[in-house]
């Protein structure tokens, strides 16, 4: 392998799905200031909005994840209109 090709900061990171609270450990180069205790060790924490544990494609369930209130905003503008 060539030296200096791969990033130095490639390390284990905990990813936390904020829609359902599931966490998993993977390697990443992401920069984060937060840490969390996971399986007896302290790791950097990255909060994500959706993952394979909550995405409708992987779960087979049709759920609506609205983290920014966009659905409510849309429904208040266009949801009550009649043809």
Curated annotation (Swiss-Prot):
What superkingdom does the record give? Bacteria
Q: Does the keyword Kinase apply?
A: no
Which Gene Ontology biological process is one annotated for this entry? translation
GO molecular function annotation: structural constituent of ribosome
An example Pfam family from this entry, by short name, is: Ribosomal_L31
* InterPro entries tied to this protein: Ribosomal_bL28/bL31-like_sf, Ribosomal_bL31, Ribosomal_bL31_B, Ribosomal_bL31_sf
The protein's matches in PROSITE patterns, at most eight in alphabetical order, are given as:
RIBOSOMAL_L31
Q: Which SUPFAM superfamilies match?
A: L28p-like (SSF143800)
UniProtKB keywords = Ribonucleoprotein, Ribosomal protein
- List, alphabetically, the GO terms of the cellular component aspect: ribonucleoprotein complex; ribosome
Does Electron transport show up as a keyword for this record?
no
Q: How does it assemble?
A: Part of the 50S ribosomal subunit.
Q: Which HAMAP family match?
A: Ribosomal_bL31_2
Q: Which family does it belong to?
A: Belongs to the bacterial ribosomal protein bL31 family. Type B subfamily.
Q: What is this protein called?
A: Large ribosomal subunit protein bL31B
């Amino acid at each position: 392998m060539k030296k200096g090709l791969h990033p130095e900061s490639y390390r284990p990171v905990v990813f936390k799905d904020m829609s359902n609270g599931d966490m998993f450990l993977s390697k990443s180069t992401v920069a984060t200031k937060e840490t969390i205790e996971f399986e007896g060790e302290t790791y950097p924490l990255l909060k994500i909005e959706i993952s394979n544990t909550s995405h409708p494609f992987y779960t087979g369930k049709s759920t609506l994840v609205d983290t920014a209130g966009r659905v409510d905003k849309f429904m208040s503008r266009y949801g009550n209109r009649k043809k």
